[in-house]
Amino acid sequence: MSIKGKVLRELESHPCRMGELTRKLGNNKKVQAALRELRSQGIVQEKAGLYALKKEQKPEGEPCVLVKLAETFGFAKRDDGKGDIFVPGRSLKGAMPGDKILVKLFERPRVPGSMEGEVTAITEPENRLVGTLIQLPGGRLFLSPDRCPEVLIALRRGGAGGARVGDKVAAALTHRGERHSDHQAAVTLRFGSAESARQCARAILFSHEVDPVFPDDVQNEAAAIPTGIPESEQAHRLDLRSEPIFTIDSAETKDIDDAISIKATETGFELGVHIADVSYYVRPGTRLNEEAFARATSVYYASSVAPMLPKELSNGVCSLNEGEDRLAFSCLMQLDAQGRVQSYRFAKTLIRSRVKGVYKEINALLAGTAEECVAQRYREVSGEFAAMKQLYRKRVAQRKARSAMELETKEGKLILNDAGVCVGVECRERGVSECMIEEFMLLANECAAHLGRTEKLPFVYRVHEQPDPDKVNTLVQMLAACGIAAKFKKAVPTQRELGQILDEVRGTKLEMAVNTAVLRSMQKADYQPEPKGHFGLALEDYAHFTSPIRRYPDLSIHRIMSDWLAGVRGEELRRRYEKFAQDASRQSSERELNAMQTEREAEDCYKAEYMRAHLGESFEGRVSGVT
């Protein structure tokens, strides 16, 4: 039995003083350490030197997660979403970032009106750490955790696990005390030098539970999937292999999940958006599906990806590769001369992409600047380009008519050398073909959501709710500081009112600052089982249908819509998918946020690696926020 277990056994019989415990159990230091840990966990209490088990009662406090830890304070995020609580260092009780805790609010905070409190219990400790191994004068090894670098955690004797000073490592807390200085850890995994962006990115993925490698049983299922399409499956699909269908992606894309076909008609346009039919291969009850649900999204950073599906599917049998027969889920739309959808239908199809289009090449073709060899590659589908341009212009007019938000944001593209070292950062350019594909995908997404809502299907919607009034007030104050008098008719502005402000600053020095401020006033889009519309796009109906290789919500509605197309209706459809839609919405929202943070932190490592080669140089920049 451990020393902690022995202490608990003694205290179960009666309260004890330290002297009595050490006489019975020996080893004064171990008894003291066990008592400190039991007190920090809220199991034992001490009063006037007498130790006793706490009575069976729930500790007081608000359920929270510790989200920030500095040397002398921390911040706890309330589970109810009512803001963050400041916790002074002496009141942290050794809590670490990621710990689920209870925090009791002070009746008299030092700052009137603020939320301050103390940790009363650690209900679910997070004992995993990622950080850098350092050595202090005297030779003792410590971990400087990435999430709280000021709070050094001592390594237990022999706990380095072969790691060297300066390495990025994963570690586990092996001992917790009431103070952070009492904690001890041991290295569980060595990534490599903290000077390497690649190794730091690996550590970040690990800390966010993003694994580029699949479990063996999942990999085995993927490897067992036949690459051919059974004739029995081909027989009941709409065969579109004779249509001039093609894909458009970046040159390096390997997981191609969308293709288009388009032609002008007497009354307008016929647009087909053809999406990889992942739901045919990833079935309920399989390990592939369980793993896809757990991941919920692919994570992209630098030149790497941690995929939602094994490459046998994502880059292979599901990917709409040029010249290969593929199963697809198609949205076939009829649009009028103004680009408005008049009708649509969804169908399980069999397609063959004529060409793997590349954004940069198609932009050149549309501009009339492409070389002849490039034009030859696209000769089978180039007849569709005129209709693409016409429909896109009509759709842009439709977007403006409904006052969809047009926020200008810039995204960096990392340039890596052959060794994987970042040697440049460029602004990612968006040409007209990128905008076209985005608009055509949006149409298919809107049609899918319209079907879900009007047919009352259990569903996963992409929801963007209207801005929070408090955030709008902050925006108004920021705009006033920029000399812009924002006068909204109601507490929440309309898309048109916000659009007028964006138009006012477009092309000026204030453009980026105002765009950023407006963006931050918005709610975060998420996935929900109820249709609530999309504020930013100014749409009543919206879902994600077009990327099932890399997003689980898309795969979810493919599965639901497939059963609906097969004739499943009413109570049976609800029985199969009502809870599934709720679970998929929650999981997809959580993992999307996690993926965004992972990607941002990983790419920051590469940007820092690039800037290290420019120490001492001067650059211009913008303040993007104050924390």
Predicted regions located by residue number:
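Alpha-helix C-terminal capping/helix-coil junction sites
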Residues: R39-S40, E46, V396, A480, ...
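Residue-level detector of short coil/turn "hinge" positions at structural boundaries
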Residues: Q45-E46, P212, R402, F459, ...
